[in-house]
Swiss-Prot record:
Signal sequence coordinates: none
Keyword Phosphoprotein applies: no
Assembly mode: Part of the 50S ribosomal subunit. Forms a cluster with proteins L14 and L19.
Protein name: Large ribosomal subunit protein uL3
GO biological process assignments: translation
Pfam families in the cross-refs: Ribosomal_L3
PROSITE patterns registered for this protein in UniProt: RIBOSOMAL_L3
Native organism: Nocardioides sp. (strain ATCC BAA-499 / JS614)
One Gene Ontology CC term in the entry: cytosolic large ribosomal subunit
Length: 223
């Protein structure tokens, strides 16, 4: 059985990192997120869909680049086409209305959130970079195999390589979630959210901000 929580969510664009001063005159590294205006394009309820959720749209897109079903979906919501659509499961779905706009003040300073993004692509990487292998000795008989992975299996038994063996390959471009990121400040005038520390993804990448699922601020409390 799925436990429904009172989740809030926004979509935004990662602008990059900078540093600011806090109230104690300490430098705090922050990531700047431009959340802009999000719009609720659909509300799911147990009566119609079997669960509670909201669909949030973000980002501009030329209306000529959307399909007719998509155009009808946005027209039904009474909004212009949006580039990104994300569904957020929340027990508070009944509190939202289709066409409602969500701003950066959805979250407040000091709140903990989970940030989901697509990690930077690193291309084809070896096992030392991709999986943290130690490599082979630099000397003492090691000959041109300093960064090799070593053995990947046994001999005639089992006579194959097991699935899941860590090897070299494409690294990055994965969906990554950083949990319990603290909101340092919210600028409603500019539509910006400052998050303490780093978050996944490159500059200009799409990020999804959700209420923290395992927040230390609400541990032991009902959410």
């Amino acid at each position: 059985m799925t436990i429904e929580r009172n989740m809030k969510g926004l979509l935004g664009t990662k602008l990059g990192m900078t540093q600011v001063w806090d109230e104690n005159n300490r430098v705090v590294p922050v990531t700047v997120i431009a959340a802009g205006t999000n719009v609720v394009t659909q509300v799911r309820t147990p009566a119609t869909d079997g669960y509670n959720a909201i669909q949030v749209g973000y980002g501009e897109i030329d209306g000529r680049k959307v399909t007719k079903p998509q155009a009808g979906h946005f027209g039904k919501a009474g909004t212009t086409p949006r580039r990104h659509l994300v569904e957020i499961r929340t027990a508070l779905a009944a509190d939202y209305t289709v066409g409602q706009e969500l701003a950066v003040d959805t979250f407040a300073a000091g709140e903990e959130i989970d940030v989901t993004g697509t990690s930077k692509g690193k291309g084809f990487a070896g096992t030392m970079k991709r999986h943290g292998f130690a490599g082979v000795s630099a000397s003492h008989g090691a000959h041109r195999n300093h960064r090799k992975p070593g053995s990947i299996g046994a001999c005639a038994t089992p006579g194959r390589v097991f699935k899941g063996v860590r090897m070299a390959g494409r690294m990055g471009t994965d969906t990554v979630t950083t949990q319990n990121v603290t909101v340092h400040a919210v600028d409603t005038a500019k539509g910006l959210i400052l998050l303490k520390g780093a978050v996944p993804g490159p500059k200009g990448g799409l990020v999804v901000l959700r209420s923290a699922a395992k927040s230390s601020l609400t541990s032991g409390k009902e959410v």
